């Protein structure tokens, strides 16, 4: 019933265990974080977020691969983790402080659940009054037709390392003109930060691995 918050290894393992087969207590017993701290649960993070009331927690819903393959078991575990996270968020009254960014994987979960991970995640987030962004680079019109209001995209497909990319002809402005919320990630170089900061009043978020530098430019 707990949701663990962690960046899994390449094989989707946490402390060399498959998290969908173990409890939080078992995952914690198998090891700590690199700094010695206990492996955190979603509730642990939400407690901190709510204490200050100034931070928004984004949860990245991955497509869990098992032995390097996307499987029915893995897709169901991904969708169910998001659904359980939404239940915890609602129980803790954190709907305005937690949002999801969801894998763009378009494979149906299973024959008994003929929808995708992102469809299940969007429905779960919407049901509790939270938001979910879709990490799939495609025609902005697809977002509208699927009822997905928010695109979370890599800078590599738009403007990256000082160069205009606009993959498939889709630019920052095209997503904005479609009426979508747009957030971007991996704006790490100065030139890229400067480019996206020109849109700072229109973008939903600009994500970077160097937040102090970005905030310095922002201000």
Segments from the language model and where they lie:
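Generic beta-sheet signal
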Residues: 6-7, 120, 185, 209
């Amino acid at each position: 019933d707990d949701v663990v918050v962690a960046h899994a290894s390449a094989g989707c393992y946490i402390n060399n265990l498959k998290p969908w087969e173990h409890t939080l207590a078992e995952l914690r017993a198998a090891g700590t974080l690199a700094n010695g701290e206990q492996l955190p649960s979603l509730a642990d993070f939400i407690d901190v977020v709510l204490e200050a009331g100034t931070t928004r927690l984004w949860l990245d819903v991955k497509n869990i691969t098992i032995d390097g393959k996307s499987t029915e078991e893995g897709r169901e575990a991904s969708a169910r983790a998001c659904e359980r996270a939404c239940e915890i968020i609602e129980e803790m009254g954190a709907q305005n402080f937690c949002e999801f960014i969801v894998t763009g994987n378009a494979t149906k979960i299973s024959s008994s659940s003929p929808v995708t991970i992102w469809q299940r995640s969007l429905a779960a987030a919407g049901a509790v009054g939270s938001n979910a962004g879709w990490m799939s680079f495609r025609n902005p019109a697809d977002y509208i037709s699927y009822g997905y209001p928010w695109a979370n995209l890599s800078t590599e497909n738009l403007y990256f390392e000082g160069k205009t990319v606009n993959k498939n002809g889709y630019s920052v402005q095209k997503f904005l003109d479609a009426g979508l919320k747009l957030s971007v990630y991996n704006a790490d170089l100065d030139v890229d930060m400067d480019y996206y900061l020109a849109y700072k009043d229109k973008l939903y978020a600009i994500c970077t691995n160097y937040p102090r530098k970005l905030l310095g430019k922002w201000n």
